[in-house]
Amino acid sequence: MKRLVSLSLALFLSLSAFAQIDYSNDSLRVVNAEWRVDSLDGFTLKRYHFGEGELFCSAQHLFLIEIPASSPRRLAFAHDSIPVEVSTLAERSGALAAVNGSFFDIDAGNPVCFLRINGIDLGENTPGKDDSINRKYYQYATLKLADGRPLIAVPDSNRRWEESLPEKDIMTAGPMLIMNGRMVPQRDDRTFVTHRHNRTALGIRRDGTTLLLVADGRFKHRAEGLSLPELERVMIWLGCTDAINLDGGGSSTMYISDKPNNGIVNYPSDNKNHDHEGQRPVSNAIIIL
């Protein structure tokens, strides 16, 4: 019995220590990072590589687009009925920059989250296997564009909620990462949440600045990727008051026009090589015009 009590106490102390991890050093590393900065036409590209063990006890490679509220640049959505690379969607649209958008069926190619572009509904929130009414975990945040400016909303559980919205450009993804300056608690029973993956996210600062973040992943010792709680922390350290998670993994891609390597600035992992050639064909993208 004493041994059982001792083991239980040790487990409790271990879990308590885990729950009280001190992220102050990580936050300072993000806030004080000497980003490689490219000032572009109405927006800024920033890049920073955290070496092995430097951020969340791991190596991380972050790519960030910042669009000031005063910029003439606007966001839009691009889509194709057949998955194509982010660079292709961007070039067809004459975009200055782009990141991958929301989730899609990798086999069939269709969106699995609600998508409306220029007033035309192109995708719906696909139901779960046992539930035709409620939405899935990655459908619990909605990105709306008003004159090219992003607004993030939390939908209700009914998966058809977006259909009644008046905005002409709507993209559902998720989950919500930050709302009103606070991190949103995430379910911890899914590898989608707890495991490290490549990530793409959109955030908004209080002053109206829009952030588009891509975190590379799946490259041990170079870029291990982020869990969703780690992604939340990065976004809040970057000053976001609201933020939404987008499709990630092999889909995570950032494009900047006129850059080398077909405009791809990060290291997409779909080809499993640490280069700029690993774009995954996707259903949709967020573009900067």
What name fits each language-model region?
Residues 59-64, 139-140, 174, 196-201, ...:
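Short glycine-rich loop/turn motifs
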Residues 1-24:
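Bacterial Sec-dependent N-terminal signal peptides
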Residues 166-189:
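Short, conserved active-site entrance elements at the starts or edges of catalytic domains
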Residues 20-142, 151-152:
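Zymogen propeptides
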Residues 109-131, 188-204, 212-238, 251-289:
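Conserved, well-ordered active-site substructure
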Residues 68-71, 118, 144-150, 179-180, ...:
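Short acidic-glycine loop/turn motifs at beta-strand connectors
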Residues 72, 102-106, 158-160, 191, ...:
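Solvent-exposed loop/turn segments at secondary-structure junctions
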Residues 98, 202, 247:
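A residue-level signal for conserved active-site and pocket-lining positions in enzyme catalytic cores
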